[in-house]
Regions:
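N-terminal secretory signal peptides that target proteins for export/translocation
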Residues: 1-16
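Extracytoplasmic small-molecule ligand-binding "clamshell" domains
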Residues: 42-119
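A ligand-binding cleft/hinge motif common to bilobed small-molecule-binding domains
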Residues: 123-134, 183-187, 210-211, 215-249
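Extended ligand-binding regions for polar small-molecule ligands
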Residues: 74-83, 155-158, 165, 170-171, ...
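Bacterial N-terminal signal peptides
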Residues: 17-32
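Periplasmic-binding protein-like
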Residues: 56, 145-150, 232-271, 291-297
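Bilobed "Venus flytrap"/periplasmic-binding protein-like clamshell domains
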Residues: 69-83, 150-200, 222
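Acidic, polar ligand-binding/catalytic clefts
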Residues: 90-165
Length: 297
């Protein structure tokens, strides 16, 4: 399944343009003057569980492996719930064809027309000012990681890459529908297009790199680092570099959470739980478990 097509986090940023960097320095939601929905928060506590919406097919954050849902966001959902004295009730879902605003509608503030959802909170939501303004029905807050695209390449075949032109004549790859694919296809004024191979999944593109089928691949840093761990490959043999492209956000993008707009007490509780995980080192350990270096948002 195509995570970037279905999730659209990376694809969303193809259309986004340059985000406001200053906003992300203060991305946490400010609650001054708000009237928390204590009654709804009490219902959650009485139920004993926190319903958490997670994307399907988004390794290393959330994916079904051997019939078990696993990944960074899965572990984070469990840790947040435990910190709040609750158990996690996972609601995995496929992304809506209408994009991430449709995902927020289905999984946070309204529910799917087939009766699935809404959850109490959704993870892996881009914390971006323009996106927040477009989705007033939800609170988007608590960034916990910064993601971005990198170019991983085979050092035995390419000595150094500092610009797209350095890939001339080399077979490259990326995931279908991703911003990384668009960057390669448009890089060097389109001169690389004939050598770009498109794969159904980022993992497949990375395996093609490791096997020698291609010489370089454009994926997210988390996908790259996780693949190094699971495939037992060396970063010295397969290093990464960051290339500038009009279709890639220059500083990557922050990912956080979303709750329904009137659930401010819940958002406060989640913010506090996340901070506790950060201070104890548990958040970093969760990422490290999957081979991913957490990047401050």
């Amino acid at each position: 399944m195509n995570a970037c097509l279905r999730l659209g986090t990376a694809r969303f940023f193809c259309r986004l343009g340059r985000s406001l960097a200053s906003f992300l320095l203060a991305a946490a939601v400010i609650w001054v003057g708000a009237a928390p929905a204590h009654a709804d928060m009490e219902k959650i506590r009485q139920s004993g569980s926190l319903k958490v919406a997670l994307y399907k097919g988004l390794p290393p954050f959330s994916d079904n492996v051997g019939g078990q849902f696993t990944g960074i966001d899965v572990a984070l959902a469990d840790a947040l719930s435990k910190q709040m004295g609750l158990s996690a009730a996972l609601l995995p879902f496929d992304a809506d064809d209408d994009g991430m605003s449709g995902d927020l509608r289905n999984m946070v503030w309204k529910g799917h027309y087939l009766g699935y959802g809404p959850a109490d909170v959704m993870l892996h939501v881009p914390v971006d000012p323009a996106f927040i303004r477009q989705n007033h029905q939800v609170l988007i807050f608590a960034p916990y990681h910064r993601e971005g695209f990198v170019l991983a390449y085979d050092h035995d075949r390419i000595h150094q890459v500092s610009r797209f032109e350095d890939l001339a004549g080399q077979p490259t790859g990326a995931e279908k529908g991703s911003a990384g694919a668009n960057a390669l296809l448009s890089g060097a004024q389109g001169a690389l297009r004939d050598k770009v191979k498109i794969y159904a999944e980022a993992d497949a593109a990375l395996l093609a790199l490791f096997s020698g089928e291609i010489a370089a691949v454009m994926v997210t840093r988390s996908q790259y680092e996780s693949a190094l761990k699971t495939q037992g490959k060396s970063a010295a043999r397969f290093p990464v570099t960051e290339l500038e492209s009009p279709v890639l956000p220059p500083r990557g993008w922050a990912i956080g959470m979303a709750v329904k707009e009137d659930q401010r007490a819940l958002a406060q509780a989640l913010e506090s739980a996340l901070q506790a995980l950060r201070e104890s080192g548990e958040l970093q350990r969760i990422f490290a478990r999957y081979g991913v270096s957490i990047v401050a948002p």
